[in-house]
Every structure is written in structure tokens, then in C-alpha cells.
Amino acid sequence: KHGAMTYLDEVHAVGLYGSRGGGVSEERGLADRITLIEGTLGKAYGCVGGYVAGSAALCDFLRSFSSGFIFTTALPPAVAAAATVSIRHLKESNAERMAQRRQVKLLRDLLDQRGIPHLPNPSHIIPVMIKDPTKCRMLSDILMQDYGIYVQPINYPTVPKGTERLRFTPSPLHTDADIMNLVDALTVLWRQCALAHAVA
């Protein structure tokens, strides 16, 4: 309507959304309306590197003027080959996407059953709300040291003060037992740290 350029960061979505893993823009039928799409070869694709997709002129401009790109080197051939195979696989297979959705739903349901507050959203990323930077870091450390569960604490300035959280992303390779172990650990730590429970 206004002729604006649109830039979409799909790093959390490629491989996971859309019938062929093209991301939210594919899932919603908007890919042809986006000026520039940024994605990653990490996360769902399990490799390293990233990309931008747009017109030839815009991509050429970025190659010439993006300070983060100008002095970089190309991906090693083995990484590029692995990424290509991964992309091809996820374009054809829905099994991984469906398995992840199942595990995301399981974790959300178990958190709800235990009264552990998390932000409701349509994403596969589940932010468990701690709302205290010291406790957020402490919980992250204890989960790693005592339970072997790695989770990154998300504190200010990444999020506003008072909204500190642990951010969980279940994968299709996490078993039901893995998710139950996580929820059991969070239940124990919630009680030990006297954190507020969600209101039903």
C-alpha cells in the first residue's frame, strides 16, 4: 500500500515453518512480498552461516557495503554441502517439523500443569518467566550443574528489566523423558527459589 521495503528476520523460522521449511513468509504466503529475507544455516539446518535473499541489485549492494560481510570469507565447501543436504531434506520432510510441534506442545502442557509461568505465543520458543536477573542466572547455572540441562538466561538489556526469562526450544530429538526431566527440575527449583506460580 505504501511502497515500503520489508525486511524479515527468519532465523528462528526457516526449516520449521511452511510446508517446505521456507519460514513464516512461506507459511503465510507472503514470501513474494518481502523485500529482503534473512535466514540462518544454524538452528533447524544444523550447520553454520547465514544468508539474505532479495533482488540481485539489493544483494549486490549488501555485498559491497555491509561492513559485516566485506572482509568475510565464503563457507567452507564441506559446510556448504552439509547445509545444501539439510535444506533439501527439510524441503521434502515434514516429520521433523511435526515432531518438534509435538514436543513444544508437551512442554507447554506440562508447564501449565505445574503452574510454571511461560509466555503464550504461537512460536516454538517457550519463554519461562523468572522476572529476577539474579535468580534467572542462578537457575540457569543450577540446571546445568545439577541436572545437565543447558538453557541460556535472557536478562536485561536483551529484555526489559522485570521480564527476565529462561528460553526453551524443544527439538524433535528431545524425548518425552527429556522434557519430563526438565519440568521436574524446574518444579523443584521453583519451590526452592520461591518463585511465583502462574494463575490458572
Identify the role of each PLM range.
Residues 9, 44, 159-161:
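Short glycine/serine/proline-enriched coil/turn segments at secondary-structure junctions
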Residues 3, 133, 198-200:
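N-terminal glycine-rich, Lys/His-bearing helix-loop that initiates the first secondary-structure elements
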Residues 2-5, 12, 17-122, 135:
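Active-site C-terminal subdomain of aminotransferase-like
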Residues 145-146, 157-200:
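PLP-dependent enzyme catalytic core of the Aspartate aminotransferase-like
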